[in-house]
C-alpha cells in the first residue's frame, strides 16, 4: 500500500492553536484512495522544518507529500501553485518559533527562483469544492515558514531525483482563534471542514498525477 506524508505546524506567533496540526493529527492513520496517511508535526522554524520533513520522507518513503499550514485572513482552503526561494517574515511582524527573523534571504542561495507544486492543483481544488468545501488556487504561499518548507521539500526531491510528488495546502484560522480579540472579523473554518477538504484534495492527487486542463472559476487573486 502506498503512503502519504502529511505535515503540519504547531502554534506560532499569536496563533495559540494551529489548524494544520489538528488537521494533520486527525488524518493520521486514515486510508485515502488505498493509501495510508502518516502525519508528522514539524518545527515552525526556518531550516529545521526542512530537515524534519527530509527525515520523515526518508523514513516513510511516501509517494505523495502534502504539507499543511495556516494562512490567516483567507476564507477558503487554498492549494499553492508556487514556492519561492525567498524568506521575508519581518514584513509580517513575525519571527519563527526559534525567534529567527529573515528579511529577503533565500532558502538556498544556489537554488532556482521558484518551484511549481508537483500535485494536480486545479483538480484538488475542484475535488474540494465538489465535497462542499470552499477552496481556490493560490499563486502566493507567502514568505514565512510555509513557503520556506514547501520550497525546501520540492528542492530536496528535485535534487535527490526522488519520484515523490509534493504540494502545499493552506487552511483558514480555526473559529476559536478567530474569536480572539485581535482576530475579530478574520475568516475561519472548523477542523471537520478542513479535514473533509484536505481528504478530497489528497484523493484527487492520488487518483491523477496530471492536472485537469480546463479552467476553474477563481476569486482569490494571489
UniProtKB/Swiss-Prot annotation:
Q: What is this protein called?
A: Pyrrolidone-carboxylate peptidase
Sorted alphabetically, which SUPFAM superfamilies does this protein's record hold?
Pyrrolidone carboxyl peptidase (pyroglutamate aminopeptidase)
The UniProt subunit note reads as follows: Homotetramer.
Gene source species: Mycobacterium tuberculosis (strain ATCC 25177 / H37Ra)
Record field: catalytic activity? Release of an N-terminal pyroglutamyl group from a polypeptide, the second amino acid generally not being Pro
Its annotated compartments are: Cytoplasm
Does Chaperone appear among the keywords?
no
The family database entries (InterPro entries) matched by this protein are listed as:
Peptidase_C15, Peptidase_C15-like, Peptidase_C15-like_sf, PGP-I_bact-type, PGPEP1_Cys_AS, PGPEP1_Glu_AS
Give the EC class as a word.
hydrolase
Instruction: Locate the active site.
Output: 80, 146, 170
Q: What does this protein do?
A: Removes 5-oxoproline from various penultimate amino acid residues except L-proline.
GO biological process, alphabetically ordered: proteolysis
Q: Which UniProt keywords apply?
A: Cytoplasm, Hydrolase, Protease, Thiol protease
Q: Which GO terms describe its molecular function?
A: pyroglutamyl-peptidase activity
| Keyword Lipid metabolism in annotation | no
Q: Which top-level group of life is the source organism from?
A: Bacteria
Query: Do you know which Pfam families this protein is assigned to?
Result: Peptidase_C15
Documented EC number(s): 3.4.19.3
Q: Which family does it belong to?
A: Belongs to the peptidase C15 family.
Amino acid at each position: 500500500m502506498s503512503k502519504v506524508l502529511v505535515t503540519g505546524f504547531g502554534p506560532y506567533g499569536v496563533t495559540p492553536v494551529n489548524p494544520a496540526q489538528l488537521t494533520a493529527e486527525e488524518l493520521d492513520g486514515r486510508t485515502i484512495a488505498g493509501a495510508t496517511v502518516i502525519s508528522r508535526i514539524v518545527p515552525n522554524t526556518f531550516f529545521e522544518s526542512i530537515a524534519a520533513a527530509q527525515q520523515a520522507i526518508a523514513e516513510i518513503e511516501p509517494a505523495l507529500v502534502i504539507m499543511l499550514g495556516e494562512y490567516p485572513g483567507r476564507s477558503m482552503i487554498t492549494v499553492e501553485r508556487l514556492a519561492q526561494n525567498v524568506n521575508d517574515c519581518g514584513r509580517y511582524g513575525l519571527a519563527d518559533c526559534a525567534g529567527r527573523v529573515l528579511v529577503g534571504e533565500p532558502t538556498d542561495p544556489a537554488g532556482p527562483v521558484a518551484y511549481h507544486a508537483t500535485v494536480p492543483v486545479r483538480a484538488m481544488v475542484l475535488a474540494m469544492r465538489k465535497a462542499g468545501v470552499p477552496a481556490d488556487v493560490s499563486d502566493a504561499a507567502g514568505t514565512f515558514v510555509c513557503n520556506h518548507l514547501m520550497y525546501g521539500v520540492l528542492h530536496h526531491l528535485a535534487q535527490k531525483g526522488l519520484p515523490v510528488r509534493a504540494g502545499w495546502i493552506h487552511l483558514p484560522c480555526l473559529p476559536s482563534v478567530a474569536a480572539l480579540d485581535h482576530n475579530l472579523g478574520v475568516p475561519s473554518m472548523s477542523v471537520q471542514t478542513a479535514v473533509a477538504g484536505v481528504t478530497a484534495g489528497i484523493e484527487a492527487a492520488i487518483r491523477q498525477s496530471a492536472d485537469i486542463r480546463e479552467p476553474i472559476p477563481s476569486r482569490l487573486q494571489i
